[in-house]
């Protein structure tokens, strides 16, 4: 909810009217009575958090939405919206992969880990770059993949799963073979040395 691409200028819309219309349309299109988790897609610079929060609470109260979360929210965006809601925000879907490592140190993961929120990682394979690029990072992914008998996608996913924030990768593929390969990430146990071996390559230098 919150993203509006059907107008002349692409924009965000977190008004109660747009959120309610989006939810009703989704329920109708999917033929269901309740949405498991509704995500506010991105921070809206024009969001009135009292209006948005009240609308989201009302959807939960009405049984149309089981839980509410966010996508691409920074901690301060999260706190602003949560301050105007009775129901808890339960998850934040953020960009996170070996190609986008900022959340490991910019406070995003620490914030959600502190409060016990579910973190979902979108683009966990770096938009496919980790599967096609040739670099020191992919070389290291391949070396671990060979040792573990999996492919580099599984290792890149295992890197996220090893974090104590209990990250849930969100896969952007319907390819059953790809999903099967990625599911083998659970077979990959990265110790601290191997985790930092990959992190170092993603960072481009040794850690300080």
Segments predicted by a language model, with ranges:
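Intrinsic-disorder/low-complexity, polar/charged segments
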Residues: 8, 15-17, 175
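Short, acidic/polar
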Residues: 12-30, 76-79, 104-107
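Short, small-residue-rich loop/turn micro-motifs
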Residues: 1, 34, 123
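Short, functionally important structural connectors and interaction interfaces within domains
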Residues: 6, 11, 22-27, 81, ...
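Active-site groove signature of glycoside hydrolases
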Residues: 27-46
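Beta/alpha (TIM)-barrel catalytic core signal, keyed to glycine-rich beta->alpha loops juxtaposed to Asp/Glu
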Residues: 43-207
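Structural motif corresponding to the early beta-alpha repeats
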Residues: 1-13, 41
């Amino acid at each position: 909810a919150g993203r509006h691409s059907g107008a002349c200028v692409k924009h965000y819309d977190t008004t109660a009217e747009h959120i309610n219309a989006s939810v009703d349309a989704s329920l109708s299109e999917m033929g269901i009575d309740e949405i498991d988790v509704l995500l506010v897609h991105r921070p809206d610079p024009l969001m009135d958090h009292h209006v948005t929060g009240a609308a989201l609470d009302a959807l939960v109260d009405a049984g149309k939405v089981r839980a509410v979360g966010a996508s691409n929210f920074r901690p301060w965006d999260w706190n602003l919206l949560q301050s105007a809601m009775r129901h808890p925000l339960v998850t934040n879907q953020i960009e996170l992969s070996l190609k986008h490592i900022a959340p490991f140190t910019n406070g995003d993961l620490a914030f959600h880990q502190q409060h016990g929120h579910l973190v979902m990682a979108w683009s966990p394979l770096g938009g496919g770059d980790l599967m096609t690029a040739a670099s020191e990072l992919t070389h290291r992914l391949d070396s671990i993949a060979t040792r573990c008998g999996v492919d580099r996608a599984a290792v890149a996913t295992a890197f996220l799963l090893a974090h104590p924030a209990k990250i849930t990768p969100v896969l952007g593929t319907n390819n059953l073979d790809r999903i099967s390969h990625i599911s083998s990430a659970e077979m990959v146990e990265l110790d601290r040395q191997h985790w930092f071996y990959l992190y170092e390559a993603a960072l481009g230098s040794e850690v300080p």
